[in-house]
A protein has these predicted regions:
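C-terminal alpha-helical "lid/dimerization" subdomain adjacent to the S-adenosyl-L-methionine
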Residues: 139-193
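Conserved alpha-helix/loop element of class I SAM-dependent methyltransferases that forms part
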Residues: 25-44
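A short glycine-rich, Lys/Arg-flanked "PGG" loop and its adjoining helix->strand segment in the class I
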Residues: 121-133
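Short catalytic micro-motifs in class I SAM-dependent methyltransferases
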Residues: 110-114
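C-terminal lobe and adjacent flexible extensions of AdoMet/dcAdoMet transferase-like proteins
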Residues: 199-201
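Class I SAM-dependent methyltransferase Rossmann-like catalytic core
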Residues: 2-31
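Class I SAM-dependent methyltransferase SAM/SAH-binding core
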Residues: 49, 54-95
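A conserved beta-strand element that flanks and buttresses the S-adenosyl-L-methionine
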Residues: 107
Length: 201
């Protein structure tokens, strides 16, 4: 493992460092936050699941909502519990210990590119199970850097631990069995390119 890869791994293991460097590289997530504000219904008391919530970087957007954040990383969840409002649980997105039809909407940011197609299907099936009929999923996932000139974006993908960064068509194919795509787009967040899809079950 190279020096840069070790640095990325070290940063990823520490919630405060992770938030700081990701915010720096992604312009404080302004583009991501704008899409969340547009596509999810915020502050209306809705039951919302932030799946793969990490250290809770977007919890502040859901003030007034019944927010549950779930992540497999206990350090991230401990940090979120100390610093954010909401309920935060350690959990495997492929097999959620949550009741059927518990949520009105789900945010998935930067989770599925860590998972194989089989595991991604398991996550989407769980999302469909815990959502009410007609519930929304906003999935924002890493895609290969759009511009060849985005050297830092290419470098980050080469060392980042997401082993399943997919082209857009692969995400669309995976989503099609579980939900209808209401709106989708490519967006740039700092040096990172994402595919954002608003899905309706």
């Amino acid at each position: 493992m190279g020096v840069f890869s070790k640095l990325v791994e070290t940063i990823s293991d520490h919630p405060v460092l992770f938030i700081f460097f990701r915010s720096l590289l992604e312009n404080d997530f302004r583009a991501i936050r704008a899409v969340i504000r547009r596509d999810l219904r915020l502050g209306q008391g809705l039951r919302t699941l932030d799946l793969g919530c990490g250290p809770g970087a977007f919890a502040d957007l859901f003030q007034g909502d019944d927010l549950v954040g779930a992540d497999v990383n206990r350090r991230y969840i401990d940090h979120a519990r100390r610093t954010r409002k909401g309920t935060f649980v350690v959990g495997d997105a492929r097999k959620l210990e949550l009741p059927d039809r518990r949520f009105d909407q789900i945010l998935i940011f930067g989770l599925l590119h860590h998972l194989s197609d089989q595991d991604t299907r398991a996550v989407l099936a769980e999302c469909k199970r815990v959502l009410v009929p007609g519930g929304r999923i906003l999935a924002i996932e890493d895609i290969p850097a759009v511009s060849r000139l985005n050297l830092l974006g290419h470098l980050l993908h080469s060392v980042e631990n997401g082993e399943h960064i997919r082209p857009i068509e692969d995400y669309r194919r995976l989503y099609a069995d579980y939900a209808r795509i209401e709106r989708d787009e490519v967006l740039r967040s700092g040096v990172c390119d994402y595919y954002s899809a608003l899905l309706v079950t």
